[in-house]
């Protein structure tokens, strides 16, 4: 019995640490896509929704330095359930309130209900409806600036939602760039 509890705790703790091998593979995939499709080759944004929502799981990846240059917590879609805090589900269906997986182009900047926001264009079948669904990058005042594990972050209606301070940092990176790739995976 004690062995099972210890094993569960070890698995639970380690599942909240980013898998760098996986991240490097996703970054390489993103870079290849950016080169082939004439997108920004300075950096991309990776979101690993396999991680606990209370840890950093949005990563700004520098293609030039081949490493993470910034990271912070990000919300996932709540769906129609009150129980999707740490086991996100994904959808491309309008009104599902779930996040979508896949590559997106970060599109135009605008001032929305939550301040500075960025529209997204889905580049894959799994996220082809993100613009129609109004899935965007935006801030929310209840999102933490830093990790809060083992607590959970608030959930969104499918949007890539970060804290106001982290949105300001993202905006500094994005506002003068074009065709930046956002890659959401699990």
How would you name each of these model-derived features?
Residues 13-157, 164-180:
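Cell wall/extracellular polymer interaction/catalysis modules
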């Amino acid at each position: 019995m004690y062995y099972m509890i210890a094993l569960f705790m070890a698995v639970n703790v380690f599942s909240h640490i980013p898998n760098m091998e996986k991240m490097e593979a996703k970054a390489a995939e993103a870079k290849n896509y950016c080169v082939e499709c004439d997108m920004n080759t300075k950096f991309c944004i990776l979101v690993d929704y396999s991680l606990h929502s209370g840890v950093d799981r949005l990563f700004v990846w520098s293609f030039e330095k081949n490493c993470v240059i910034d990271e912070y917590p990000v919300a996932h879609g709540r769906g129609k359930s009150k129980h999707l805090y740490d086991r996100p589900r994904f959808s491309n269906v309008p009104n599902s309130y779930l996040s979508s997986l896949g590559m997106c182009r970060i599109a135009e900047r605008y001032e929305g209900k939550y301040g500075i926001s960025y529209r997204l264009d889905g580049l894959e079948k799994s996220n082809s409806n993100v613009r129609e669904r109004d899935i965007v990058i935006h801030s929310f005042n209840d999102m933490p600036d830093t990790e809060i594990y083992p607590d959970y972050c608030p959930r969104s209606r499918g949007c890539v939602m970060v804290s106001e301070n982290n949105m300001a940092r993202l905006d500094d990176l994005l506002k003068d760039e074009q065709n930046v790739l956002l890659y959401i995976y699990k």
